[in-house]
A protein has these predicted regions:
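Class I S-adenosyl-L-methionine
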Residues: 1-65
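S-adenosyl-L-methionine
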Residues: 60-82
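A short acidic, Gly/Pro-enriched loop at the edge of an enzyme's catalytic core
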Residues: 80-90
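Conserved Class I SAM-dependent methyltransferase catalytic core
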Residues: 16, 107-168, 173
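Conserved acidic residues
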Residues: 26, 88, 157
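Glycine/threonine-rich flexible loop motifs
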Residues: 100-106
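A short SAM/SAH-binding and catalytic strip from SAM-dependent methyltransferases
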Residues: 91-100
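Catalytic phosphate/metal-binding cores of nucleic-acid and nucleotide-processing enzymes, i.e., regions
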Residues: 13, 89-92
Length: 174
């Protein structure tokens, strides 16, 4: 699985969107939407929801779900989205360590690049809900370094650790 495309389990997707307390008027972006597991909850609230997915098969599924996805590499989402898309909330479950096949190496830095680009697009004062592997947590050196780097742009208010077994039935474990 070159791009590390593992769908977010529905219960985890629901929890993330619930905790963000989405409101009428919010503009939502899911920059690496995959099967739309996160975006469907925002869309169910009738919020303006934008999806992006690089994989053509998953984009087709997003279209079936009623989205009009763009097809950019989420690592560069801020560079390519039209200026009118200025989300008040970003929901994401980026690849934890995959480069999308561009290099032979995997590193959590690739997933962090997705996060940085989405953060750059987030409206000032907006909300950001993200699912990361353990390497993205504050208690890992890599994660701590990353969050310190972006701390001027975002305030971490809550971290929930989820047992990797929640992902087994979706084809992966963290």
């Amino acid at each position: 699985i070159i791009r590390q495309q593992f769908s977010t389990p529905p219960a985890i997707a629901y929890l993330l969107t619930y905790l963000l307390n989405l409101k009428s008027g919010d503009q939502i972006l899911e920059p690496s939407a995959g099967t739309g597991s996160l975006a469907v909850w925002a869309n169910g609230l009738h919020l303006e929801t934008y999806t992006n997915e690089i994989d053509s098969r998953r984009r087709k599924l997003l279209e079936v779900l009623g989205f009009n996805p763009t097809a950019y590499d989420a690592e560069f989402i801020n560079d390519f989205l039209p200026p009118a898309i200025s989300p008040t909330c970003v929901l994401m479950n980026p690849p934890f360590s995959s480069s999308g096949g561009r290099t032979k190496n995997n590193s959590s830095k690739f997933g962090f690049r997705h996060v940085e680009s989405a953060l750059a697009r987030l409206k000032k004062g907006g909300k950001f809900g993200i699912i990361l592997s353990e390497a993205g947590g504050l208690d890992s050196k890599t994660g701590n370094d990353f969050w310190r780097k972006v701390s001027d742009r975002i305030e971490v208010k809550l971290i929930i650790k989820i047992d990797g077994r929640e992902y087994y039935k979706n084809g992966s474990a963290t």
